[in-house]
């Protein structure tokens, strides 16, 4: 994250989408090379692409508007979807004799915070690709209006991650946010007001990563690094496998929990489950889950107490509120006119920004674990689940150490499978949605629930 985050600044500006067809052409030409050189991905395949081909045909004929609701386990997901658009959809369309207008693309909705930690150039790239940003944790009416307008009137379909962010787990879907469903109903409303009879659809898309060759040795080496960093003795396994590495992973997780529990009880005067209470839980995984839940709640409380926020809702909702509160302390309305601010006021503002960033650090730790359970590996002990869990622990340690590295270690070459699901019709549900506010809320909830089940079925 850039050092500028520690200084008080004017409010975050909206980055308007400014689609540049020439820039998209360059990106699509370079994309396969970029994926080969900059990611661990060696193969991308897709299932039910013909469904997407037909949807694009209908979209281009003016019959439908649709949004792709895609799984978001990793930051590589947009590259995979862009490959689907630029390579796989045109290929399948040609094989089926379907004429599509090129380019095949989508207007992505992305988190406005990404350019803050990934670099301002990312905002420029996203804008020129026709993407539109939104701020999490608040009613970002400017961002919502932009997304709503693109859904109804954009040159391309929409694409968004209903989970709201990455969770690092290919086979565990976070609880979906209702925004995708709400945008769908708004689109249906806008089309009706404009006298347009296009159908509105939401299309679930699954993305799943797997290793070409099981990287047990790389996982073992990473475990050794994490053990050394956390003060545990390093005892490399002679033969790396789930049987030999799982006890080490459990021991590492328990040790890290102990360190963090001491950190919060000693220096932040928080109360956590005592050893006697935990000792009564016979199963190690269950004990870990209980301790982790208590620790995550405590870490968020530290942030919430500073920003005077109520501790309500899911962990993800609480994280987003903390993030928005932190941004409000850093990106301030009263700093719009920097020239009119005295040196003392600026220095005080920087102090507030620095403290806000420090308090947000606790929330960043929690963010990595919002979808983690104590049984993810045990219920299906694959190398993918083991690697994902180990990488989450790596991310936690990296945040504690203050490492600036954005990218996770690459443990081995991966292949990606994208699955296009059955479209969910918003237009069919719109008459019931129109009834009253209660019916509208119920309609959004039902679509969100159906989308959740559909995406879980694509794993």
What positions do the PLM features span?
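Membrane-interfacial terminal anchoring regions of lipid-handling membrane enzymes
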Residues: 1-104, 111-113, 118, 135-137, ...
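Short, basic, glycine/proline-bearing loop/turn elements
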Residues: 128-135
């Amino acid at each position: 994250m850039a050092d500028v985050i520690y200084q008080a600044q004017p409010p975050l500006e909206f980055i308007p989408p400014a689609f540049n067809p020439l820039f998209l052409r360059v990106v699509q030409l370079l994309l396969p090379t970029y994926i080969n050189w900059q990611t661990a991905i060696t193969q991308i395949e897709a299932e039910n692409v013909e469904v997407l081909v037909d949807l694009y045909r209908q979209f281009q004929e003016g019959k439908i508007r649709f949004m792709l609701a895609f799984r978001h386990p990793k930051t590589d997901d947009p590259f995979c979807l862009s490959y689907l658009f630029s390579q796989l959809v045109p290929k399948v369309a040609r094989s089926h004799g379907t004429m599509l207008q090129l380019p095949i693309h989508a207007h992505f909705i992305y988190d406005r915070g990404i350019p803050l930690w990934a670099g301002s150039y990312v905002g420029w790239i996203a804008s020129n690709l026709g993407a539109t940003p939104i701020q999490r944790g608040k009613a970002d009416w400017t961002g919502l209006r932009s997304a709503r307008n693109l859904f109804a009137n954009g040159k391309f379909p929409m694409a968004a991650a209903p989970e709201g962010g990455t969770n690092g787990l290919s086979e565990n879907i976070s609880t979906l946010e209702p925004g995708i469903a709400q945008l769908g109903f708004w689109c249906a409303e806008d089309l009706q007001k404009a006298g347009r009879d296009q159908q509105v659809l939401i299309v679930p898309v699954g993305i799943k990563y797997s290793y070409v060759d099981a990287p047990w040795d790389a996982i073992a080496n990473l475990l050794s690094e994490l053990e050394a960093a956390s003060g545990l003795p390093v005892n490399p396994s002679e033969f790396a496998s789930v049987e030999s590495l799982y006890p080490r992973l459990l021991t590492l997780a328990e040790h890290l929990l102990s360190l963090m529990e001491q950190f919060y009880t000693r220096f932040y005067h928080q109360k956590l489950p005592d050893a006697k209470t935990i000792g009564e839980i016979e199963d190690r995984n269950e004990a870990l889950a209980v301790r982790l839940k208590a620790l995550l709640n405590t870490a968020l409380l530290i942030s919430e107490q500073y920003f005077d926020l109520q501790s309500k809702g899911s962990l993800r909702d609480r994280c987003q509120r903390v993030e928005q509160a932190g941004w409000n302390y850093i990106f301030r309305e009263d700093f719009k006119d920097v020239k009119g601010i005295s040196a003392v006021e600026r220095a005080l503002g920087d102090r507030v920004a620095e403290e806000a960033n420090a308090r947000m650090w606790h929330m960043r730790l929690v963010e990595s674990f919002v979808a983690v359970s104590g049984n993810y590996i045990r219920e299906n002990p694959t190398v993918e689940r083991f690697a994902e869990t180990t990488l989450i622990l790596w991310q936690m340690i990296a945040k504690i150490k203050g490492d600036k590295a954005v990218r996770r270690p690459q443990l081995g070459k991966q292949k990606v499978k994208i699955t296009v699901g059955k479209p969910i019709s918003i237009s069919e549900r719109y008459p019931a949605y129109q009834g009253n506010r209660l019916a509208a809320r119920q309609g959004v909830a039902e679509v969100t629930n159906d989308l959740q089940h559909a995406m879980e079925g694509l794993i």
